[in-house]
Amino acid sequence: TLLFSACGMTANTVSSPVEPTVKSNEKTAVNNKALVYFSKDISPVSLIKLYDKINQDIHGKVAIKIHTGEKNGPNILPREIVMALQQHVPDSNLVETNTFYKGDRYTTAGHRETLKVNGWDFCTVAIMDEEGAVMLPVKGGNHFQEMSIAKNMLNYDSMLVLTHFKGHTM
């Protein structure tokens, strides 16, 4: 199942990704809930249709955050749908972060090699923490007054996150 989520004013369900249908009239502004779209069609056309439903607040330079997987790993998003989406989103490129655990993606050099092996070389892939981290203030934060983020995140105006459910521990 392809799941797409975004914050917005209404909660809609896509029953058919080719011709999306609104199934709910619940107001997310009142309930502070995110929109969640589902599709059983995992294809470039489906992902682009879902993106087109939520892209009204995505602007400027766009980071498309993906999980690129370990070398030759089985848990990799289908590259053809990511490639189609990236080509559809103006002024976008893929972004990723190095892993906290030791492995193929622990260093930027190792990560770049893994990107090539796994076929993520069809566009620029920025390693967000390649130049370290930066502390940003959290306005009105209840638990944190500042947070550490990957420094290269400051180079983007919007971020679209594509992920998969892994079901494994770190």
Label the model's feature ranges.
Residues 7-170:
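N-terminal and secondary-structure boundary signal
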